[in-house]
């Protein structure tokens, strides 16, 4: 369903957009128009999620890249032995494998919240998991891609805060079906994909609290994400450009 649920492409509409796509972020009149449209889309995503600022919306190539961005850019710098990374047995591999891998790289413990026979998370296991060490990450999907289970987001995010952990939410399945307010949820990061919302493929977005994004290292390096390049050092652009290297998706 990750690719079969997307709408059919209107070839003529795509062809009509080519002149603008080719001119994106280039300093010429067409580029200015394309950039304005690009940033207008960012504001629409901000409003859709009720994020506090456009600076908190990073465009990516999909939910998978968004979640990997957090796992690598935050996880590699903040996890270590004695820390615990928590996800669930309901989660898509995109919100499971990156955390498993980064936990292994950093020496952190990787733990999952099990699922009962009704397809619900066994929240009674949270106390046991908390006893494994210092919980630093709680990653989960709002809605399971396999069973359609609606996970108790408020409870999981509250537990993450109690543990002093960040919360990372996969909203790919939920975004087409329910309103999402990141400020009301209180999550630290949230990822979604355009094609789940009848948009184009290979386009996604990551919401991240500005205070966290500012402290994170870049995930990809290259054009459009730098402020200045010198032989001795390179400085990064402001949010969200710091995480948007290369040609826009």
What are these regions (language model features)?
Residues 1-249:
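Pyridoxal 5′-phosphate
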